[in-house]
Amino acid sequence: MIAGGVGSVDARHQHKLPLPAGTLLVQLGGPGMRIGLGGGAASSMGVGSNAAELDFASVQRANPEMERRVQEVINACRAMGDNNPILSIHDVGAGGLSNAFPELAHDADKGADFDLSRIPVAESGMSPAEIWCNESQERYVLGIAPERLPELEALCTRERCPMAVVGTVTDAEHLKLAAPGEPPAVDIDMSVLFGKSPKLRREGATPARTELPGMDLSELNLDTLATQILQLPAVASKSFLITIADRTVGGLSVRDPMVGPWQVPVADCAVGLLDYRNHHGDALSMGERSPAAVQDSAAASRLAIAESLTNLLSAVPDDLGQTKLSANWMADAGSAGQDAALYAAVEAASRLCIELGISIPVGKDSLSMRARWKGDDGQRVKEIGRAHV
């Protein structure tokens, strides 16, 4: 299953503001734990080939209550409009604080000094690398002027949201992480982290196209064929994904997930309001053509984009240029023919979007889509290079 979402941002808050030297760097949210330390090492491996220690280290553990508290603080800051105390903000994802804080400073062409002892942790005995690199959820990093700190502290106290000032911005583009009285755990120039790394070169051979063999239809049973086709996830009803949960939360859903007088078919797209006072909103649709990718990944990529756009038509968009795509590229990278299939899918999507005048500003790659069991020489299931849009 693939899940996605859409959001909106006030035009006044869409650009990060400069971070002068002395700006406070704050961690907002819960403490760090030994979570996600498998990180990219685990996500780059096929299911079934991981070591138990790596599986445990890479697993994520969510805390919805903490996420809600953090979100309420951010919402309160956003509601201040031009008086928003947040100068710049990042969510903490892959790489943990070791990625989020340096990116925050680098975006402002600055450096930063961090006090390792100020970073909140929930487990004893964590090494500096574990504290700095763990991927615990429900955390954000932000820059705030020193004089605005009392306001942020008051908001966090009201919402019972943990926060900690863990560093300051410096003019020198240098990154330092140290605990008082201890040698620095990190002491490097920002250029080492953000310098131009060499591009990865991959070569993949395009396999020869094989024509589908002719089929003897005389022995096929129509009922059996219909049942098999209707069981295909790309064809079957998706209603079970809706009926297992609440249809709407918050009262801003305009288009009910199910349509028609008996509420049986699933709607082509989702439509939600931005607030309770106006009639502006967002529409969200999806497209995927997995069966077509078996024969032609480029065609499947174009079909997925076409499906997402035609599903969106029921919301009657004013202009196609208002549409933004998010593509999830999926493949079993490295296996025979899959690198070439993925390249063809990306190239086809790029050319089509250029012709249509739309862009794919965001997305995700899932390039270890394979599962194996009974060892490396046993059974294997793999993904075909394609795109979800």
What are these regions (language model features)?
Residues 1-386:
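Glycine/proline-enriched, intrinsically flexible loops and inter-domain linkers
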